Every structure is written in C-alpha cells, then in structure tokens.
C-alpha cells in the first residue's frame, strides 16, 4: 500500500518544499465532511503514482503556520508542489483547487500523468522493498 505522509508545521519544509519529487498536499481538518470525501482520492493518487509523486496531508487546525503561509482559507484545498525552479530561478508557485475533485480531474489539473514512474523504476522499487 502506498504511503501518505502527514506533515506538521515542523516537517512541511522537508516533506514538501525540499522534496525532489512533485507533491500533492491535502489541506484538511477532522471536522470537515468534504475532506473525508477527498481522502480516497488521495489514496488513489498515492497508489497510482507511487515512487513518482508524494502525497502529504496537513491538518490545518493542528498546523496553523502552514495554512497561513499558503493562505489556505477554505478546505479541503488540494495543492500541487512541483520541485525545482522556473525560468527566472524562483521556486514554482504551487497550484491549488478547493473542494472535492475526483482522481481524473486532479490528474488533469496538475498534469500528473507526466510523472508516472517508468516500469523499470517500479520493478526496482518493488524488488528493493522485498
């Protein structure tokens, strides 16, 4: 089963901003009904793009610094953080959507299909995990 990581105010930079892979971040809260609908879609992304794209969850109530830093005003917010820098040398600006989106819409919104692991990478990761 693919791993979904949980980021805190203290671990967000390492898990997301300094990651060498693209990261889909689910900003959520325990009391948020629509956030519960998003969880299975995050599991699908984590499984389908395992090894190529990381999935991270952030509880906005428990981690207010992250929410404020990225101006998260509504939840669920799903954000996509691309590694590296743009042509000007600045980090890519994260893309985000508010509300539930099925896997197919998230793939299109964030152009995720370009990050699918190559079959050789998948096989070597499965072999090294065994």
List where the protein language model places each region.
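Structural microenvironment flanking redox-active thiols in thiol-disulfide oxidoreductases
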Residues: 58-67
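A short beta-strand-turn-helix
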Residues: 4-23
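Short pre-active-site segment immediately N-terminal to redox-active cysteine/selenocysteine motifs
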Residues: 20, 28-31, 74
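Conserved Rossmann-like nucleotide-binding pocket used by diverse enzymes
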Residues: 8, 28, 54-56
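Typically the conserved alpha-helix immediately C-terminal to a functionally engaged Cys/Sec
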Residues: 34-49
């Amino acid at each position: 089963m693919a791993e979904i990581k949980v980021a805190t105010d203290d671990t967000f930079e390492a898990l997301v901003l300094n990651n060498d892979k693209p990261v889909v971040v689910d900003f959520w809260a325990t009391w948020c009904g629509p956030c519960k609908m998003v969880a299975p879609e995050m599991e699908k992304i984590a499984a389908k793009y395992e090894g190529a794209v990381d999935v991270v969850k952030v509880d906005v109530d428990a981690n207010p610094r992250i929410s404020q830093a990225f101006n998260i005003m509504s939840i669920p917010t799903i954000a996509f953080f691309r590694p590296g820098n743009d042509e000007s040398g600045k980090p890519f600006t994260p893309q985000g959507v508010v509300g539930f989106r099925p896997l197919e819409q998230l793939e299109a919104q964030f152009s995720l299909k370009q990050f699918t692991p190559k079959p050789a990478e998948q096989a070597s990761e499965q072999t090294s995990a065994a």
